[in-house]
C-alpha cells in the first residue's frame, strides 16, 4: 500500500474483495467494495452510487474481524503466497473419498470428535458465506465471535458452536489419506494429514467502508432473500 492512501476500491465480486483484504492486511486503510461480479455481499455497492456517496460523506467505516492460523508439523503446499490470515473462514477438508475424524479443542477443552467431510472456522463476516451453506448461524458483523461448523457431519446430533473472540481453536484429523485440503478464504493449499492447525482471532481488524444507505439487514434481504416468503408474493 502506498503511504498516504486514503482508501482502496475493490472492483469485482466478493472474491476480489477477499484478495484485496490480503493486500490491505493490517495497514488500517479501509476498503470499499464495488460490485461488478455476481452476489456481491462484501462488494455490495453499485458503481453509479459510489462516487456521490463518497464525495458527500454518506458512508461509515466498520471493523471486520480476521482469523489468524498457525500450521504445525508441515509446510503448506500448493500456494506460493501463503498468508496466515482470513476474513471469512479457515477450513480443513478431506482430499479423498474417506470421511475425516476431526479432533477439536477450544481453549484446551476437547470437543467430541467430528466425523465429517471437513470443518469450518468462520468469523461473523464468514457467517454469510461457506458457513451459511453448511447450516451455520448468521451473525452480525459487529459480533466478535468464531463459528465452529462441521461440513456434512455423519451425526444427527452435531450442531454449530459459537465461541468468543478470545477462544483458541486447535484442530487435528484422522484420515486414511496422506493429505487434507486447507483453505483460507479463496486460497487453497495441501497439508499432510499429520499436521495440526491452530486458529484464533487476529490482533487486527479489516476496515470496510459501508455506504449510509446500506445496512447488514438490508444486505441479507436484497442479496440472500432472507425472510422472503413466496407464498405471500414476497410481502414482509
Stretches found by the model and what they are:
Residues 1-5:
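Short acidic low-complexity segments
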Residues 14-16, 39, 125-127:
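Short glycine-rich anion-binding loops that position phosphate/pyrophosphate groups of nucleotides
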Residues 19, 23-34, 41:
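Gly/Ser-rich helix-loop-strand patches that form or flank binding pockets
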Residues 39-117:
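Catalytic core of DAGKc-family lipid kinases
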Residues 84, 92, 110, 159-236:
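ATP/nucleoside-binding phosphotransfer catalytic cores, i.e., glycine-rich phosphate-binding loops
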Residues 104, 126, 182:
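Short aromatic-centered micro-motifs
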Residues 113-157:
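Gly/Ser/Thr-rich active-site loops/lids in small-molecule metabolic enzymes
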Amino acid at each position: 500500500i502506498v503511504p498516504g492512501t486514503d482508501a482502496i476500491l475493490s472492483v469485482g465480486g466478493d472474491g476480489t474483495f477477499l484478495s484485496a483484504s490480503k493486500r490491505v492486511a493490517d495497514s488500517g486503510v479501509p476498503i470499499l467494495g464495488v460490485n461488478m461480479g455476481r452476489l456481491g455481499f462484501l462488494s455490495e455497492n453499485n458503481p453509479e452510487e459510489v462516487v456521490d456517496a463518497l464525495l458527500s460523506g454518506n458512508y461509515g467505516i466498520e471493523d471486520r474481524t480476521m482469523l489468524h492460523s498457525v500450521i504445525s508439523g508441515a509446510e503448506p503446499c500448493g500456494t506460493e503466497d501463503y498468508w496466515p490470515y482470513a476474513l471469512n473462514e479457515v477450513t480443513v477438508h478431506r482430499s479423498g473419498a474417506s470421511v475425516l475424524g476431526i479432533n477439536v479443542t477450544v481453549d484446551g477443552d476437547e470437543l467430541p470428535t467430528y466425523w465429517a467431510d471437513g470443518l469450518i472456522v468462520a468469523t461473523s463476516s464468514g457467517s454469510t458465506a461457506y458457513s451459511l451453506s453448511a447450516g451455520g448461524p448468521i451473525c452480525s458483523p459487529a459480533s466478535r465471535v468464531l463459528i465452529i461448523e462441521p461440513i456434512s457431519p455423519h451425526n444427527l446430533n452435531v450442531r454449530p458452536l459459537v465461541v468468543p473472540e478470545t477462544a483458541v481453536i486447535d484442530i487435528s484429523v484422522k484420515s486414511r489419506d496422506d493429505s487434507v485440503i486447507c483453505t483460507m478464504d479463496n486460497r487453497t493449499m495441501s497439508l499432510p494429514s499429520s499436521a495440526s492447525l491452530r486458529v484464533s482471532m487476529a490482533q487486527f481488524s479489516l476496515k470496510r467502508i459501508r455506504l449510509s444507505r446500506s445496512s447488514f439487514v438490508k444486505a441479507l434481504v436484497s442479496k440472500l432473500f432472507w425472510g422472503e416468503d413466496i407464498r405471500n408474493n414476497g410481502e414482509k
